[in-house]
Amino acid sequence: MDTTLQDPLVGQVLDGRYRVDARIAVGGMATVYRAVDTRLDRVLALKVMHPSLAADASFVERFIREAKSVARLAHPNVVQVFDQGTDGAYVYLAMEYIAGCTLRDVLRERGALQPRAALDILEPVLAALGAAHRAGFVHRDMKPENVLIGDDGRVKVADFGLVRAVDSVTNTTGTVLGTVSYLAPEQIEHGTADPRVDVYACGILLYEMLTGEKPHDGDSPAIVLYKHLHDDVPPPSAAVPGMAYELDELVASATARGPEVRPHDAVALLARARDARARLGDEQLDAVPPQALASEHDNADDRTSVIPRALTVRRPLPVNEEDEGADAAHRTSRFRSPPPLPPRGRTALRRGPMAIVIGVLLVLGLGAGVWYINSGQFTKVPPLLAKTEKEARDRLADAGLDAGQVSEAYSDTVERGSVATDPEAGARIRTNDSVSLTLSKGPRTVRVPDLDGYPQDKARSLLEDEGLKPGMSTREFSDSVPAGSVISTEPGKGTEVRAGSAVALTVSKGAPVDVPDVAGDDLEDARAELEEAGLEVKVATERVTSEYDAGRVARQDPGPGGRVAEGDTVTLTLSKGPEMAEVPDVVGDSVGEAREKLEGAGFRVDEDRGLLGLFGDTVKGQSVDGGDSAPKGSTITIEIR
């Protein structure tokens, strides 16, 4: 069912001006609609805050003030804010409508991007953030969902001002706003934010574009937050072998855990990004990343969230682990006492106190029995993650449990020697039962196979058979390896790596071919010579004037002496003949005057003095008569007597 049809705003006119046509997206703080400004007759995007936030008067006040400030931020890479207002319970922003998609859509469809494409997106994002930083704004919620890519290729940053307004409120409520995958450590630990939190988020953004995955991931937001605080962002080349070192440096500088080590704002990071691009060659910029599907995307992790700042982020516990103290504090048991007996005269009165005592004892006994049946004979498996076998046995004994069978298994997430439990931590189990322990052997490792000389497709298949991923492919000339076959791998053959790692391939372009010089040749002769050298020939449709006769080769690309691969194409541009010019009449002129006229008309000049003209200075004749035409650049001989 189309949920747009159920949205109460669709079809309404907000503030007597904005007609809501369709719902575009729903986020953690607002819903975005496509709307029409009925006064100006233009399509725009209308962002309407969720009622739970719009009901906060202090939020609305700050939001309006911030929105007005951001509306003055004019930059070609910032989504423009046209208007802000309220209509009853609705608080809205009227913004520029961008027909296109988000960076998240691109990553979901394509996975990793080529370095050139990643930098083409990153640089306008940093330009937009740099303008905001210099104007005193911090975005605070940079993520692929807030990078819009128009159908015309323009890159724009959305949601300026919105996150700042919400953060102004959350500073007073002890919370931090943001999307956990892109939060800087200082945002998590102290709730502080300056331009360097945007720099950090852009570093994560670049890593994700280059590798197709996030640097820190986990089963819960708490695990991701812990990794941001305690783990460095790995270099992109660890996920995509062969990635240029300059890109590793760029990501590392932007994602340093200490804010004082990062570039101080987006302008500084933009300068570093442009410097990195300048130091990369075309092969590095256009290197094709592994053709893998984009990683599964969890929308919940990329939704802007309000995170309690008071939360101390500890080493993440297993998903099912519970805090027993908290559980007990919130658990209440209720027992019903039997109804009072009706009075039965004096004997009943005398036996009343005894009956009450017996009744209470019966209730307590019944309650204890119920407790034992339901809870007393059970205990919880204590958390054993990251414990040694001895520590795990001791903790089990303290909980009244025995250690059962101990086995070993590979794990990509649990360190070597650490313990995972079965049943899992927090599970209810009968007292004195045994718990099987699984001891991690660490990640499974494999050796990079010897792929030298294999065709590229076969090499990729062999890597996948070994549990490895094909990495980036670069191409080089080789006199010994046939074109299309593997020259080498990175890491090299025999290297022990983690299963699932990517291996970069260097593929042969074959032996280089020296391009012969065919300028000035007849087309058929030139074609024959190039094809004999193993090259393809393409003839340009446009002809140019040159010193060569019409129909002959005027120029070639690549030029003579260039090194290309067998089968590459050489483009020939044919001559339409030399450019003609009228020859000036210089008979009777002095030598100096004649030379000036002829050279001014585009000709070269040669002098024929003979024996009689050794000391003369007057032109008595010329090789091409005055008024006739001759090719520009040709030589006119003057006779001097």
From Swiss-Prot:
UniProt binding sites for ATP: 24-32, 47
Active site per the UniProt annotation: 141 (proton acceptor)
Keyword vocabulary terms for this entry: ATP-binding, Kinase, Nucleotide-binding, Phosphoprotein, Repeat, Serine/threonine-protein kinase, Transferase
InterPro entries per UniProt: Kinase-like_dom_sf (IPR011009), PASTA_dom (IPR005543), Prot_kinase_dom (IPR000719), Ser/Thr_kinase_AS (IPR008271)
A UniProt-annotated Pfam family: Pkinase
Record-annotated Protein kinase domain positions: 18-280
Documented EC number(s): 2.7.11.1
Gene Ontology MF terms: ATP binding; protein serine kinase activity; protein serine/threonine kinase activity
Matching PANTHER family: MITOGEN-ACTIVATED PROTEIN KINASE KINASE KINASE 20-RELATED, SERINE_THREONINE-PROTEIN KINASE YBDM-RELATED
Name by which UniProt lists this protein: Serine/threonine-protein kinase PK-1
Organism, as annotated: Streptomyces toyocaensis
The organism's taxonomic lineage, starting at the top: Bacteria, Bacillati, Actinomycetota, Actinomycetes, Kitasatosporales
Gene that specifies this protein: spk1
